[in-house]
């Protein structure tokens, strides 16, 4: 099993994070791409770095979006090499 290509940083109680999770889950399921979700409240360094920007998505380890996830843009990032 390969590493997840998409990482979603968020925290509990964040409604934008819940919206982002639904989009990421749908796009990744459609494309057969793995993804993971990380709660930034469990890591002080991540909280410092991303606390004001969540939800933050990374594609292949690079920051892709923050605050909102654009499904078309995410799909494009995952299908272009």
Residue ranges and their predicted role:
Residues 1-27:
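Local sequence-structure signature of Cys/Sec-based thiol-disulfide redox active-site neighborhoods
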């Amino acid at each position: 099993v390969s590493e997840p290509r998409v990482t979603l940083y968020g925290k509990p109680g964040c409604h934008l994070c819940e919206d982002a999770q639904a989009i990421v889950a749908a796009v990744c399921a459609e494309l057969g791409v793995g993804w993971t979700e990380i709660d930034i409240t469990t890591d002080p360094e991540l909280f410092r770095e991303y606390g004001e920007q969540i939800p933050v998505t990374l594609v292949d380890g690079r920051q892709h979006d923050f605050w909102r996830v654009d499904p078309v843009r995410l799909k494009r990032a995952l299908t272009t090499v």
